[in-house]
């Protein structure tokens, strides 16, 4: 959200006030009883006592929840805000210190000599100027990594929506009595808080959740608001108000790596070197703004600290790393279809670990009723038993809505389990299912009711749930049970939804067996794996978009990720199916799914069967490597599928690569995005050993840090083992579920 008109001017609709200097600083205790720093930054310089009248100030609090992490809370007016709060995990061993070197002021409070107020936690500090021009500097190991300069922070009124003061007196020295006696009708305007942090030369920005726009975010406007917009626009299912800033170094001691996490669940807007090309600006509506600076030795170190700060990742069970096969969405399927597909995979010697039933396991117009459509599945208990005897896990589709035709609608409405309009009527619309109502997950009784419906399915034999949707949540004219601000509850809704589902899975299956297959996400959702990339399109461009979105998501605090192999929308041509199969089975989680087309390989061609068999077996055989890497990634709080620069931080060439990636520490994967098999990929310096290859290809490529161009059949792609690393394999494994540590 831009407030300025170029470099010099503000947009006419905004009244912008900035801290000009820090008038006072003091040491306080934070909520954990640790030392914190509080300052009062005034909107004009204090040169005499008269300057203390008719001006505002920002109260700034600096605190530390964990080592090398500093939180900043900016407050204009104190408000009793009902915006939901993300979970912040504090470290008991953190011991921040506060140092205040006061400036010198004269008898009227005017600054004569500047001072500093500093909070330090481990290797990170924030230093705020006192009694001089406002500046706030963040230093890691005594090196400045970013700063908030004069006029960066701001308290902003949108005077097109109202005014607390007559416009003629805004910024004037009119007395309070004169203001109160004014005959102008005053309406509270929309108010925003803003911060801008410096960007050093050659600093690249990543993150913000799953975004399908260019991988490096410099130059972009990013709005943090969950939307169901597919994979082909700037909208995102998984918005995370966090960015990773990286300035490549020439060695491990010279790079700069830090993250910025804006701890606001309501929509937040970022201008990434766009409104001001030397800064990242972020803002949110309201009277306060809280953010955290997270510093580290490396980009992986920063991501790990952010991951742990917001709850840490959970490890999904081994069977989830195998192949998932779906009924697809709008296809015609029944018990007969399902068994035909499963038997077809067996006959063709293709390992299968999970079978997924999409929406129409329930009757249309009744999602969700949590009951099998007996016309298509007359004996669901028997069907689930037969699937389990084939050593398959079963996933079924759900969403957090109850359609009006569902038998559950009347009960939910009567008992107050749905989000309401402000007038008390149930909030409904016809988008998706007719008369959709939203489960109100802020109501504990509604959560228990919803979980009980899922519990019955788990007792029947269902193993996990695809938690679809969670983005289209009302932001206006909406009332939540706990009084949550709808603007903040919108993004937070997916957390409560997936938390409820994950909890019942843990209760019934145990934590080691709990897994969801989720589309939407917010801060902290990494606790509820796995997430998939949403509704992509069946073409090579969308395949590339999917990878780019995944890498963006995985540089935002998440560990595991999947996508619809072959694309979701439209029909998939055989060549795309085969290329995407390679890519999909070299992701952390692998699922065939579509909209109007089945995704079993023999419906494409016989070579598709061969490709699916080869790469599914390869992934199963790599389970010792994949699962050990998954455990390590969870422990460190880093992604399993990761962009190249996370592993090669001293190689500047890796920082823009978004068409290849590392799968764990050892494996480099370069998917092929065309029918012909032409691929161009970059190998960092060293020797790289092929794991698969076409006939005639050399086993090892030695790179000086250079690009290579090759042509591959559908049975091969650039898949290399890094020099000095290994990939543990077990060729005796038949399925991922067979893997035991």
What is each stretch, according to the model?
Residues 1-4, 52, 77, 97-316, ...:
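Catalytic and substrate-binding clefts that recognize carbohydrates or anionic sugar/phosphate headgroups
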Residues 2-48, 54-115:
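A low-complexity, Ser/Thr/Gly/Pro-enriched, surface-exposed linker/loop concept
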Residues 69-70, 118, 125, 135, ...:
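Beta-sheet entry/capping signal
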Residues 79-81, 249-251, 267-270, 329-333, ...:
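Flexible loop/turn segments at secondary-structure boundaries
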Residues 83-107, 420, 691-716:
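Solvent-exposed beta-strand/loop surfaces of large extracellular or lumenal domains
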Residues 314-484:
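Aromatic-lined carbohydrate-binding/catalytic grooves of carbohydrate-active enzymes
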Residues 324-327, 331-347, 386-401, 448, ...:
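Gly/Pro-rich turn-and-neighbor structural signature
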Residues 502-515, 521-532, 545-549, 553-563, ...:
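Catalytic core of carbohydrate-active enzymes
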């Amino acid at each position: 959200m831009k407030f300025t008109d170029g470099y010099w001017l503000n947009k006419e609709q905004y009244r912008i006030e900035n801290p000009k200097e820090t008038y006072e600083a003091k040491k306080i205790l934070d909520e954990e009883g640790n030392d914190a720093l509080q300052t009062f930054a005034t909107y004009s310089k204090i040169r005499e006592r008269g300057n203390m009248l008719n001006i505002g100030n920002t109260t700034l609090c600096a605190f530390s929840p964990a080592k090398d992490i500093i939180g900043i809370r900016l407050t204009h007016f104190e408000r009793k805000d009902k915006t939901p709060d993300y979970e912040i995990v504090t470290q008991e061993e953190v011991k921040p210190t506060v140092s205040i070197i006061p400036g010198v002021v004269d008898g009227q409070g005017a600054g004569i000599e500047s001072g500093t107020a500093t909070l330090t936690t481990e290797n990170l500090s924030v230093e705020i100027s006192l009694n001089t021009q406002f500046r706030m500097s963040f230093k890691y190991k005594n090196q400045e990594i970013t700063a908030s300069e004069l006029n960066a922070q701001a308290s902003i009124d949108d005077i097109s929506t109202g005014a607390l003061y007559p416009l003629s007196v805004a910024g004037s020295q009119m007395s309070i009595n004169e203001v109160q006696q004014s005959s102008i009708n005053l309406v509270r305007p929309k108010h925003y808080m803003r911060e801008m942090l410096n960007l050093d030369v050659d600093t690249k920005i990543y993150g913000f959740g799953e975004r399908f726009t260019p991988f490096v975010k410099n130059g972009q406007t990013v709005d943090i608001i969950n939307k169901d917009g597919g994979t082909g626009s700037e909208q995102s299912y998984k918005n995370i108000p966090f960015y990773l800033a990286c300035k490549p170094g020439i060695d491990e001691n010279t790079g700069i790596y830090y993250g910025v996490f804006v701890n606001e669940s309501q929509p937040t807007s970022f201008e990434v070197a766009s409104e001001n090309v030397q800064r990242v600006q972020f803002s949110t509506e309201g009277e306060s703004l809280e953010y955290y600076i997270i510093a580290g030795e490396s980009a992986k170190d920063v991501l790990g600290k952010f991951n742990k700060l917001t709850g840490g990742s959970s490890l999904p069970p081994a069977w989830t790393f195998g192949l998932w096969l779906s009924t697809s969405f709008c296809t015609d399927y029944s018990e007969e279809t399902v068994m035909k597909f499963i038997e077809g995979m067996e006959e063709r010697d293709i390992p299968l670990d999970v079978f997924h039933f999409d929406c129409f396991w329930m009757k249309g117009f009744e999602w969700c009723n949590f009951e099998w459509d007996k016309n298509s599945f007359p004996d669901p208990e028997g069907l689930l038993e037969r699937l389990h005897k084939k050593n398959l896990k079963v996933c079924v589709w759900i969403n957090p809505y109850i359609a009006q035709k569902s038998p559950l609608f009347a009960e939910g409405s009567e008992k107050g389990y749905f989000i309401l309009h402000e007038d008390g009527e149930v909030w409904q619309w016809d988008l998706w299912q007719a008369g959709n109502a939203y489960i109100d997950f802020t109501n504990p009784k509604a959560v228990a009711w919803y979980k009980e419906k899922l519990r019955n399915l788990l007792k029947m034999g269902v193993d996990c749930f695809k938690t679809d949707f969670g983005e289209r949540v009302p932001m206006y004219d909406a009332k939540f049970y706990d009084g949550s601000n709808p603007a903040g509850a919108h993004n937070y809704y997916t957390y409560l939804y997936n938390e409820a589902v994950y909890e019942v899975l843990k209760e019934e299956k145990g934590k080691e067996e709990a897994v969801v297959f989720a589309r939407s996400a917010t801060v902290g959702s990494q606790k509820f794996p796995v997430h998939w990339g949403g509704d992509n399109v069946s073409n090579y461009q969308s395949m590339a978009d999917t990878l780019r979105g995944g890498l963006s998501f995985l540089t935002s605090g998440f560990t595991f990720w999947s996508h619809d192999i072959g694309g979701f929308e439209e029909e998939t041509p055989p060549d795309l199916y085969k290329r995407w199969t390679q890519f999909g089975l070299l992701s952390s989680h692998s699922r065939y799914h579509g909209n109007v087309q089945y995704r079993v390989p023999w419906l494409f061609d016989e070579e598709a069967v061969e490709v699916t068999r080869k790469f599914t077996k390869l992934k199963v055989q790599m389970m010792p490597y994949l699962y050990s890497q998954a455990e390590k990634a969870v422990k460190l709080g880093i992604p399993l599928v990761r962009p190249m620069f996370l592993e090669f931080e001293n190689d500047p060439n890796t920082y823009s690569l978004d068409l290849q990636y590392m799968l764990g520490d050892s494996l480099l994967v370069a998917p092929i995005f065309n029918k012909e098999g032409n691929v161009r990929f970059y190998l960092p310096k060293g020797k790289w050993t092929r794991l698969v290859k076409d006939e005639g290809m050399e086993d090892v490529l030695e790179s000086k840090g250079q690009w290579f161009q090759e042509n591959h059949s559908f049975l091969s792609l650039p898949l290399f083992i890094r020099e000095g690393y290994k990939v543990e394999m077990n060729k005796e494994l038949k399925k991922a579920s067979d893997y035991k540590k």
